[in-house]
């Protein structure tokens, strides 16, 4: 029975993806206001919060290279200790331009701090940016905490951004985000929650801006229909809650120039999601660039696609964060 059930579930997901039936779209009205018992699930709840508080601690040096020094860091986020790393460029006079790199999904219990993110972070540091990577709540080395609609991850990023803005060696008007896969989802949410704090954003193979579409993909494609939603809302009963948690319904709030990259052969996150997000941002009159690649979900380091991704990202950050 299980294989048949899984096949049926995948068929339903395919039909929903192709037809758009039952999915919240940018042109749909946002659902009526309702209570958010978590205080962190809905875009409106996240926008009403304050961010920051505490200090970024450089725990120890992880690596010395000719171009940058890498530090293990930790910082507070809603009472949680979050681990990460910071690449401080050499040969660049502060105050620094900053890029925060948000990683995609890896089993939180086994997330290795360095391998996933260093190819992007190191290239950005060599280009003269101070680069910071948070590992998020619940991941190896960080405290666990609530995370409905993955909003906890966005809170961790925005608390970090608020702390970075207070650093004397950082330009508070030159902070960018670079998000891959799930980190792209985290980034999109940050753009509608604190648009005034983010001055350029790069999305690479990003998960969607629609919480319902994301749940459908995770539940049916990866979890075989057994995905347990983290939070008090039911995907079956609380569709209005999913609408209120979806950045796609708040794109009018975006103030940040956005650059989007996606591989045409991506079998993890639908290529169409990035194309559709580009269209939606353009419909709202936002500044957006979109690049398609003959590549899969993660571009191999040193490949033509990876090299173009990093060249375009660095040029984009240079243009919008200054030299």
What are these regions (language model features)?
Residues 267-273:
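Conserved alpha/beta-hydrolase "acid-adjacent" motif
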Residues 148-168:
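Alpha/beta-hydrolase active-site loop
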Residues 48-93:
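N-terminal cap/lid segment of alpha/beta-hydrolase-fold proteins
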Residues 254, 260-262, 266:
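Short beta-strand/loop motif that positions the catalytic acidic residue
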Residues 170-181:
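Alpha/beta-hydrolase fold nucleophile elbow
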Residues 275-323:
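C-terminal catalytic histidine-bearing segment of alpha/beta-hydrolase fold enzymes
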Residues 188-238, 302:
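Hydrolase active-site cap/lid region
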Residues 92-96, 101-143, 210-211:
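Short substrate-entry loop that stabilizes the transition state in hydrolases
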């Amino acid at each position: 029975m299980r294989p048949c059930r899984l096949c049926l579930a995948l068929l339903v997901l395919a039909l929903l993806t192709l037809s758009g039936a039952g999915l919240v779209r940018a042109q749909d009205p946002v659902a009526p206001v309702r209570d958010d018992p978590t205080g962190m699930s809905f875009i409106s709840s996240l926008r009403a919060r304050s961010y920051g508080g505490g200090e970024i601690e450089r725990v120890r040096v992880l690596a010395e290279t000719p171009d940058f020094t890498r530090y293990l860091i930790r910082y507070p986020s809603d009472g949680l200790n979050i681990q990460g790393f910071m690449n401080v460029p050499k040969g660049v006079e502060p105050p620094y331009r900053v890029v925060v790199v948000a990683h995609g999904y890896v089993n939180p219990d086994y997330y290795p701090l360095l391998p996933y993110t260093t190819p992007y972070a190191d290239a950005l540091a060599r280009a003269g940016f101070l680069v910071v990577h948070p590992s998020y709540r619940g991941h190896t080395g960080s405290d666990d905490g609530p995370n409905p609609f993955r909003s906890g991850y966005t809170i961790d990023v925005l608390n970090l951004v608020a702390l970075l803005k207070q650093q004397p060696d950082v330009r508070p008007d030159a902070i960018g985000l670079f998000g891959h896969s799930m980190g792209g989802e985290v980034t999109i949410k940050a753009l509608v929650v604190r648009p005034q704090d983010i001055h350029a954003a790069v999305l690479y193979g990003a998960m969607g801006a629609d919480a319902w579409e994301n749940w459908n993909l995770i539940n049916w494609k990866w979890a075989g229909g057994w995905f347990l939603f983290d939070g008090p809302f039911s995907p079956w009963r609380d569709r209005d809650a999913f609408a209120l948690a979806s950045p796609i319904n708040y794109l009018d709030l975006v103030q940040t120039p956005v650059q989007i990259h996606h591989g045409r052969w991506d079998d993890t996150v639908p290529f169409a999601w990035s194309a559709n997000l580009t269209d939606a941002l353009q419909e709202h009159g936002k500044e957006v660039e979109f690049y398609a690649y003959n590549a899969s979900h993660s571009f191999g380091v040193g490949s033509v696609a990876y090299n173009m991704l990093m060249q375009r990202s660095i040029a984009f950050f240079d243009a919008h964060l200054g030299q």
